[in-house]
From Swiss-Prot:
It is found in: Cell membrane. One of its GO terms (cellular component) is plasma membrane. CDD domains: cpPDZ_EcRseP-like, S2P-M50_PDZ_RseP-like. It holds the Pfam family PDZ_2. It comes from Staphylococcus aureus (strain MRSA252). It comes from the Bacteria. InterPro entries: PDZ, PDZ_sf, Pept_M50_Zn, Peptidase_M50. It is a multi-pass membrane protein. Belongs to the peptidase M50B family. GO terms for biological process: proteolysis. Its EC number is 3.4.24.-. Zn(2+) binds at H21, H25. Keywords: Cell membrane, Hydrolase, Membrane, Metal-binding, Metalloprotease, Protease, Transmembrane, Transmembrane helix, Zinc. This is Putative zinc metalloprotease SAR1238.
Length: 428
């Protein structure tokens, strides 16, 4: 049963993160006037779909990943090329309204054509030999036209609705929006947790056994007001003061029953592993703070949690990239789907609150990782847009396609190696 719970939790967490990421791309793409033929949750065969305006929304069989198809983004080639035999339907202006790719359709009065030349990015036309007269004809593609395959309609984007023909700024926003929405999701989750759990105060809720606070006689209900020379008004002040005092003997003042008391103690040094490549040294008294529920403090506390988590993850990513050049790189620094599943299994056992917190950190991680300047990732494609903005011309299309393809192959190889490493570490 525990395996089933973990699998369901993994599917939900991974699905939410990818869906939010891809929705960010689509949201800004549509605002920029870029046509989005499909928004998919999951990968593989389609199991459910519905169309809203020009976008087909689909749920696919494999509950891992997802995507948004943007017209003219260079990631997909048109399904028609010279040498193919297709059928076309024409309007009264002799323009193509439907390009039919198979026999699963109900259209009548259509023409068969052997394609000799075609363009779906700039001039939008098909030129070929028609079956009815065996002559070569040139047909323009209507502004509102469709590919027809397996009974589904996929709209053909006019030139001004394609990603490639937009200016650099809307391109940048469209590409950056995926990571941005991951950051927004993480922030919302951190703030939501703060509202649910309350924000920590400097009042003691519980004292840990064999830690300095207990050994000094600090009890539940005591309010910490000073550590050394540092005044304490909220829980964050406790951490800041201890970071300065470190493990030196110091005086701690606290309020109990309206009276101020003081004790001398030595904070305990602890090491907390943050990621596979970084750890944090902290000094603690050994108490759990009481929480309070207010209207505005959770917003501030959630934002602080987001910044702290983002800083840790960003530092870990930078450290990982630096290790490639310093010779300290290890695949243990990376987690693929198998590694994430293993982590979810551990977090699920700690409860739903821990799972939400882990989801928030994972969302930050997904956003940051996607901004790494590797061609197949958002960060790499943003570099192409920056080049276009600086030099006032896009990167050569063939060069861009080749670079993205190499980047995609590189990412697939890395993912295979990371997945095998995760399987070896956790299950063999």
């Amino acid at each position: 049963m525990s395996y089933l719970v973990t699998i369901i939790a993994f599917i939900i967490v991974f699905g939410v993160l990818v869906t939010v990421h891809e929705y960010g791309h689509m949201f800004f793409a549509k605002r920029a006037g870029i046509m989005c033929p499909e928004f998919a949750i999951g990968m593989g065969p389609k199991i459910f779909s519905f169309r809203k305006n020009e976008t087909l929304y689909t749920i696919r069989l494999l509950p891992v990943g997802g995507y948004v198809r943007m017209a003219g983004d260079g990631l997909e080639e048109p399904p028609v090329e010279p040498g193919m035999n297709v059928k076309i339907k024409l309007n009264e202006e002799n323009e193509i309204t439907h390009i039919i790719l198979d026999d699963h359709h109900k259209f009548q009065q259509i023409e068969a054509i052997e394609v000799k030349k075609c363009d779906f990015k700039d001039d939008l036309f098909i030129e070929g030999i028609t079956a009815y007269d065996n002559e070569r004809h040139h047909f323009k593609i209507a502004r509102k036209s469709f590919f027809v395959e397996n009974g589904s309609l996929v709209q053909i984007a006019p030139r001004d609705r394609q990603f490639a023909h937009k200016k650099p700024w809307p391109k940048f926003l469209t590409l950056f929006a995926g990571p941005l929405f991951n950051f927004i999701l993480a922030l919302v989750l951190f703030i939501g947790l703060a509202y649910y759990q309350g924000t920590p105060t400097s009042t003691v809720e519980q004292v840990a056994d064999k830690y300095p606070a207990q050994q000094a006689g600090i009890q539940k209900g005591d309010k910490i007001v000073q550590i050394g020379k540092y005044k304490i008004s909220e829980f964050d002040d406790v951490d800041k003061a201890l970071d300065k005092v470190k493990d030196n003997k110091t005086t701690v003042k606290f309020e109990r029953d309206g009276k101020t008391k003081s004790v001398e103690l030595t904070p305990k040094k602890t090491e907390r592993k943050l990621t596979k490549v970084s750890s944090e040294t902290k000094y603690v008294l050994g108490f759990q703070p009481a929480s309070e529920h207010t209207l505005f403090k959770p917003i501030v506390y959630g934002f602080k949690s987001f910044l702290i988590g983002s800083t840790y993850i960003f530092s870990a990513v930078v450290g990982m990239l630096a290790s490639i050049f310093t010779g300290g790189f290890s695949f243990d620094m990376l987690n693929g789907p198998v590694g994430i599943y293993h982590n979810v299994d551990s977090v699920v056992k700690a409860g739903i609150i821990s799972l939400i917190g882990y989801t928030a950190l994972l969302s930050v991680n997904l956003g940051i990782m996607n901004l790494i300047p590797i061609p197949a990732l958002d960060g790499g494609r943003i570099l192409f847009v920056i080049y276009e903005a600086i030099f006032r011309k896009p990167v050569n299309k063939k060069a861009e396609t080749t670079i993205i393809a190499i980047g995609a192959i590189f990412m697939v190889v890395i993912m295979i190696l990371v997945t095998w490493n995760d399987i070896r570490r956790y299950f063999l």
